[in-house]
Amino acid sequence: MAFPAPAFSLANLLNGSYGVDTPEDVERLRSEQREEAAAACRNYRPLPAVDVSESVTEDAHSLRTPDGAPAEAVSDEFVTYGAEDYLEKSDDELLVAFETMVKPMRIGQLWCPAFNKCSFISSIAMARALLLAPRTSHRTMKCFEDLVAAIYTKSDFYYSEECEADDAQIDISSRDVPGYSFEPWSRTSGFEPPPICEACDMIMYQCPCFDFNALKKSCAERTFADDYVIEGLDGVVDNATLLSNLGPFLVPVKCQYEKCPTPTIAIPPDLNRATDRVDINLVQSICDSTLPTHSNYDDSFHQVFVESADYSIDLDHVRLRQSDLIAKIPDSGHMIPVLNTGSGHKRVGTTKEVLTAIKKRNADVPELGDSVNLSRLSKAVAERFFISYINGNSLASSNFVNVVSNFHDYMEKWKSSGLSYDDLPDLHAENLQFYDHMIKSDVKPVVSDTLNIDRPVPATITYHKKSITSQFSPLFTALFERFQRCLRERIILPVGKISSLEMAGFDVKNKHCLEIDLSKFDKSQGEFHLLIQEHILNGLGCPAPITKWWCDFHRFSYIRDRRAGVGMPISFQRRTGDALTYFGNTIVTMAEFAWCYDTDQFEKLLFSGDDSLGFSLLPPVGDPSKFTTLFNMEAKVMEPAVPYICSKFLLSDEFGNTFSVPDPLREVQRLGTKKIPYSDNDEFLFAHFMSFVDRLKFLDRMSQSCIDQLSIFFELKYKKSGEEAALMLGAFKKYTANFQSYKELYYSDRRQCELINSFCSTEFRVERVNSNKQRKNYGIERRCNDKRRTPTGSYGGGEEAETKVSQTESTGTRSQKSQRESAFKSQTIPLPTVLSSGWFGTDRVMPPCERGGVTRV
């Protein structure tokens, strides 16, 4: 029996009857709740559940009644009441609903959280029940999809207080918020007065006591150019431009590249930052500390030692032909570097040098792989290649383009070398098994500290003639462009017009790197790699007859070096200079990588020739031993791995974009190269300067965080101080500023000789009275006329030959003239002649010009 609540009145309020529950009322309410709960338990009948786990057989639909109700209870491990519509859905539809509601994180082929059909359907049923249940909390419950995800992941069912505060649109005035005051905003002019130095009462930008570049904490992000003083602005900009760019409070000043004077006031230690001038001595000290064995390296006579010393080598099937060697072509000399960075001289392709290079690059092929079924396994590797890298729809819809235009571009490129359409041979009449061979005159810079014990061996090039390459190169170029268009998004080949190492929206930080170093890559390739390449080329759409023809004359070939007179047969190994060298090496590396590692675990994969680099969130899992046991490669997993490929480091800026930076250690070595030809107008030196500037165009993007990344990667890779890398960047910034700064790194001995001999601007001429031919005729007449054949000379009344020296006196003093004439006359020597009786005597004093026609001055 329910008692009416007491009415509100002053009497009930005073005696405590209104608004207060008496013990009798409390007991009455509890008894009513117990009766209602007992009635609900008596009337409740649970519905049978259906097991929709993986163990359901294919004929599970036959067990259902026509009305769709389950026939029997299979399992009661999960709740299905209210989710019958999801029980009838297929697995694919459930997966789509799972991705929509729960929004799992995909890591390779794994989902986090993992998909469980039973738990997902139970979460849907519980979410529907919770939304229909009466509200017992003042907090806002999540919407249906978010509630399903919260139940599945066992998280909070309600929105956080921050979200509730954002959803509740309440008008709150500034007076209602404690601790805050809101004032009307007014636009300012933006002018900030410059800081004034307390010591000299000058603007701190011009004050010698204040180093503005020493401020580490500034409003904007520091760039690399902030740490170095401008070398000079004379003739670059006028005063008006300088004044408008630097602000109204700065007067036009003449910028000099010099160190500021020592400050007269104390600077706090946290503001101290070195801004010393970069000079040639600093760069040399960096080389000495980073490359200790390179500073005293001089190979000026190393090749002379090799040619003149005893030589012993072990090669099979080598043919030497020393009868028609090509003599060395003399050049005009090379520029001499000021820096000593361990760079070597140009190598000359002599017989011994070529044999040494062939021994290292072409002969002694390693045999590390096991015996396998080549045809079956090569097809499996090629199939894995297409599954891992190629988008099948793009490959089916694409076609060859620009084959003919590539051919015309190739002919125009080499037109200056004498290649014309009339010189193209019939390929069926040519023996394509013969390759020309040569060594690279430029030796790759050595970054290891082994120059004191090891002499670098030059690389070799095996190539066809341009007339043959011009007919294969356009086809393979078009095929490579089609291959790039069909690659998946995470695969990058940094070659061509549509790809590069610049990756927008990808950050290399907080990633695991995988770098595989493949040694002896070219000569380690055998028949297995050739079959893999053939299957991949056919799959990409290359005409099968051309692929078969190309692979046939790569099974057995003969290389010959005409300059050195050396020839030898080779088989299967990669030709380092034909039309498919880069493309073939790239697809072979990609195929080997896909067979040893699951490519789905990587976010980005970069391939270029024999170089490979992968980025993943988790440590990469794979079997690198297959590179050796199956593919006959000497592979080494680089530890610790850093983002390094193609001799470049990959760095990320503050916006999450990745760009490439050349290896500073190799760039410093290139500053001391000895291969720049000499020219009077410095055209070759300027070409090297422009190449240097193009490689270092990244300097404008180097912020302080990028410099810190480079220092860490440099230290991890080379086990050398990372601070040296930052100092190298300072040198690069100076020598890329202008050509005059770059010219400080090189000089020529010819110019020194010209400067030494420049004191004499007069014409120096030697006139001969009696030539050698006249003297011989004179001797023959004397022997014929003189029967006694008496010796003739200064004692016998012979005539002396005189040397006349004519010299204009436009410049120079008379004393210099007399000194030069006396020095010239002092070098005359007696000329020996043959006596009639077999005795030797002295004919007369002759100048050296009559002995051999050469006068030393």
Curated annotation (Swiss-Prot):
What keywords are annotated for this sequence in UniProt? Nucleotide-binding, Nucleotidyltransferase, RNA-directed RNA polymerase, Transferase, Viral RNA replication
Q: Could you say which enzyme class this protein belongs to?
A: transferase
Single Gene Ontology BP term? positive stranded viral RNA replication
Catalysed reactions listed for this entry: RNA(n) + a ribonucleoside 5'-triphosphate = RNA(n+1) + diphosphate
Q: Which superkingdom, per the lineage? A: Viruses
Q: Where is the composition biased (Polar residues)?
A: 804-816
A Pfam family assignment: RdRP_2
Q: Where is the composition biased (Basic and acidic residues)?
A: 780-789
Per UniProt, residues of the RdRp catalytic domain are 511-624
Under the GO molecular function aspect, what terms does this record hold? nucleotide binding; RNA binding; RNA-directed RNA polymerase activity
Segments of this protein annotated with the region Disordered = 780-827
> Any idea of its EC number?
2.7.7.48
InterPro entries with a match to the protein in the record? Bromoviridae_RdRp, DNA/RNA_pol_sf, RNA-dep_RNA_pol_alsuvir, RNA-dir_pol_PSvirus
Subunit info here reads: Interacts with replication protein 1a.
Say what the protein does.
RNA-dependent RNA polymerase which replicates the viral genome composed of 3 RNA segments, RNA1, RNA2 and RNA3.
Q: According to its UniProt record, which protein family does this protein belong to?
A: Belongs to the ssRNA positive-strand viruses RNA-directed RNA polymerase family.
Q: What is this protein called?
A: RNA-directed RNA polymerase 2a
Species of origin reads Cucumber mosaic virus (strain FNY) (CMV)
Organism taxonomic ancestry? Viruses, Riboviria, Orthornavirae, Kitrinoviricota, Alsuviricetes
